[in-house]
Regions:
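Bacterial Sec-dependent N-terminal signal peptides
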Residues: 1-25
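Conserved functional micro-motifs across diverse proteins
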Residues: 20-150, 200
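A structural signal for short, hydrophobic beta-strand segments that form beta-sheets
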Residues: 40-42, 49, 87-93, 139, ...
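Extended low-complexity, serine/threonine- and proline-enriched intrinsically disordered segments
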Residues: 76-88, 272-283, 512
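A non-transmembrane, solvent-exposed segment enriched in polar/low-complexity residues
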Residues: 143-151, 184-411
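N-terminal glycine/threonine-rich, aromatic-flanked beta-hairpin/loop signature
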Residues: 160-199
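Oxidative protein folding and maturation machinery
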Residues: 339-513
């Protein structure tokens, strides 16, 4: 709804401009920025400027904001644009009030329009600065795509037919097929390029035509296709539908996923956090503990990790550096570009559509906190009502998210829906430990058990399935085998069972009883 409102505002502004003086408003669609300096902090807002309008009386900057639901953001009234050394102050903003805390909606997404003093229409590049504070928002080097597309180094390109990020060009090497390629030959004639790339084992011929209408025709290894410059921080929506409904299921036969990546332009504070990159997941079938696979970063911030998996698995890709929560499938190779300066977070690979969609469209969160929870003041029935409403809110936000992206894959839709359901069930049982008087009736346990039985395989694709299963066993044990102890219950937690059985076996006892 916010995006529709912003578009209507844009149309109205254009009409007003044409009617008032007949002079044309210059528009930049999907401009590209050199630097989005708060990108690397996951607890800060993610800002994407998706449109700029240069009118005679003002410059309008259209911005998409992503931030956790119900958290607040604020833009100071000293916000300005900087072009050719001159400041152009903000006048007002549609969608939020300057210098006031603005709370994000439950979707965690907001579209706003900033109105600034008019920039010259011949402006080639400008900065967006929220005042001069050290931690204020800064988006630097904002440029029209028609100008930026002429600069090949550095740039990322997606195949228009498949929608995949297929190749990236940098001064010293190229990225293609999840590998690094050195320039064996490098020729340029005007806006046309021809390269011979090598990875040390084989060569690759690349021919690039001059840009036309924001695109370039490229021939890679003899295959010609149309390519578009990637201007957004995550990969844009794919151009075609995908009816694949589920992740790969190996039926729990061990295999390996390979993750290659580059933490480009990583700030010193992140280097200081550690010079290793890790991929972590929970071992669902053996130890019920976290498994971590690590790789040393080279001097540029590049890495390669082999991740042994028993099936398609939800993983956390390094809490110290990138904070990515995604799914890896056995037998696949992924390349992750995470650029701390430009803001790019994109996967390359033969089968990485879901991973890119999860980056572009994070699954809405369920807010499982409520007043009185940690003081054990809320009765079970009230807790159930609160969490049900929070789940329905997140489910509604997911539905709206899917409706906005007509071509989003069936796999994303199914995975996100089941992910929310698993999280909801886990939140209920976690909340059960904090209900008033520790009374959590059988009917609610049975309700969660019903959800648990409906969760599809492979179970490893949902991290919360681990906690959900343990908590469900604990609740069943409490109901069947616990002893009332005042307002609490005395019973044996499941994580004590293996150790207790080992001790009794060592004493030649056949059972615990």
């Amino acid at each position: 709804m916010k995006r529709i409102l912003c578009v209507l505002i844009a149309v109205l502004c254009l009409c007003t401009c044409w009617a008032g003086n007949g002079k044309k408003t210059i528009v930049w669609e999907q401009p590209i920025a050199e630097s989005n300096q708060l990108f690397y902090d996951p607890f800060q807002s993610q800002l994407n400027i998706y449109r700029v309008e240069f009118a005679d009386d003002e410059t309008r900057v259209f911005m998409h904001i992503t931030f956790p639901p119900h958290y607040w953001i604020k833009f100071v009234k000293e916000t300005y644009l900087l072009a050719d050394g001159k400041k152009y102050l903000v006048k007002n903003c549609d969608g939020l009030k300057l210098d006031e805390e603005h709370y994000m909606p439950s979707s965690g997404k907001e579209d706003v329009v900033f109105h600034f003093a008019p920039l010259p229409k011949k402006t080639r590049k400008f900065d967006f600065l929220e005042g001069d504070g050290k931690k204020n928002f800064k988006i630097l080097g904002i440029e029209n795509i028609d100008t930026r597309i002429k600069q090949l180094f550095s740039s990322l390109w997606r195949n228009d037919a498949t929608g995949d990020w297929e190749i990236g060009f940098y001064e010293d090497f190229a990225i293609y097929d999840c590998r690094y390629w050195q320039y064996k030959q490098k020729n340029q004639k005007g806006d046309k390029y021809s390269f011979i790339l090598t990875d040390g084992k084989s060569d690759l011929a690349v021919n690039i035509d001059k840009p036309q209408h924001g695109k370039r025709t490229m021939s890679i290894n003899g295959k010609k296709a149309e390519y578009s410059l990637i201007t957004t921080s995550t990969l844009p929506d794919y151009p075609q539908k995908d009816e694949t409904t589920s992740l790969k299921d190996t039926h729990n036969k061990p295999d390996t996923a390979i993750v290659v990546g580059w933490l480009r332009n990583m700030p010193k504070e992140f280097w200081d956090r550690g010079q290793e990159y890790s991929v972590q997941y929970y071992d669902l079938f053996s130890t019920f503990k976290e498994v971590s696979n690590c790789s040393k970063l080279d001097s540029l911030g590049r890495f390669e990790i082999k991740v042994p998996l028993i099936n398609s698995t939800e993983v956390f890709m390094d809490w110290k550096h990138t904070y990515i929560n995604t799914v890896l499938e056995p037998g696949e190779t992924y390349y992750l570009l995470y650029d701390f300066k430009s803001g790019h977070a994109i996967f390359m690979g033969k089968n990485c559509r879901l991973q890119n969609e999860l980056l572009a469209h994070p699954i809405p969160m369920i807010n499982a906190d409520y007043a009185g929870k940690y003081e054990n003041k809320v009765p079970a029935q009230e807790m159930m009502q609160i969490l049900e409403s929070r789940y329905k809110e997140a489910e509604g936000n997911l539905r709206k998210q899917i409706e906005k992206s007509a071509a989003i894959s069936k796999c994303y839709q199914e995975y996100a829906a089941q992910y929310l359901l698993c999280t909801y069930a886990s939140d209920i049982l976690q909340g059960a430990y904090s209900v008033k008087d520790n009374v959590f009736p059988q009917e609610y346990v049975s309700q969660v058990e019903k959800i648990w039985k409906e969760i599809p395989q492979p179970y490893t694709q949902f991290r919360d399935y681990n906690m959900l299963t343990k908590d469900l066993i604990d609740q069943e044990a409490r109901l069947k085998y616990s002893t009332p102890m005042g307002k609490t219950y005395g019973f044996l937690f499941t994580n004590y069972y293996p150790e207790l059985l080992r001790k009794h076996k060592a004493q030649d006892r056949k059972s615990v009883v």
